[in-house]
Amino acid sequence: MGRWNPDAEGRLRAAALELFVERGYELTTVADIAERAGLTARTFFRYFADKREVLFNGSARLQQLMVETVNSAPKNVTAMGAVTAAVLATSEFFVDNRDFACRRSSVIAAHAELRERELIKLANLSRSLAEALNRRGVLEPDASLAAEAGIAIFRIAFDLWVQNAERRELGEIVHDLLARLKGFSVEA
């Protein structure tokens, strides 16, 4: 009998991404992913609802991190300050996963179904941030405006960060984009 290998979820994620890059998303089946990982399809479904979720299963943890960051921001911090802290917290979330994030991003970019899923996840994240700001006493439309601005910064920073030529850390890119955004609001 073979030796049990730990981290089934990680092995499934790695196998899925390898296969999505090698064969394409549409041509990869759950059975293919499980076989590559040395597991069964049944084991796959213990971790993921479907093959799309392999690419999106970190969304709940990311959302929790960002909402908790907004919730724990000091009371005197502005709505945008709390959202900025949440966006900056994402750099720690992704620090050890740059290679996975780069390959994941290219797979998503190549498939309309996955791009749509990504947009839905970002919209949910924005809504959660706005709700967290509401709980802090920030009224609408300010809460939604700050949340949407934060998600725009996050999305653009992430898109820049996963480019092969980009060498800066995610947090550095976020700071740069925030400075650019502030520059837009200065009247000439």
Locations of the language-model features?
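Hydrophobic alpha-helical bundle segments that form small-molecule/ligand-binding pockets
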Residues: 96, 122-147
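Hydrophobic alpha-helical segments that form the core
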Residues: 140-160, 173-181
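Hydrophobic alpha-helical connector segments
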Residues: 64-104
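Short hydrophobic/aromatic patch on the recognition helix
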Residues: 39-48
